[in-house]
Amino acid sequence: MKKAYELTFIVRQDPNEDVINDAVNQVQAWVEAGELGQVTKIDRWGRRRLAYEIDKQRDGYYVQMDAEIDPSGLPELERNLKLSAQILRYLLVLSEK
């Protein structure tokens, strides 16, 4: 049974917008892999200054996704997010919807 989750992540800032778009598309593909999840909304917050430096980065590109995900697919999704060089930080929480 799928549950509603909110995924917020910070993409490493890059002057080339295609790199950011590729990272967002990759995360969406991870969520939807094996039909374990479905992205319902993507909200791009844009470039923001970080509160503190992460991996020598002062700025990041914030993205928030709403998704319906089967809990059995969460470990693989979190593993991919942790191992991605483009994702600085992420937060995955159960939505209150």
Give the ranges of each region predicted by the language model:
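Long, contiguous binding/interaction regions
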Residues: 1-60, 64, 68-97
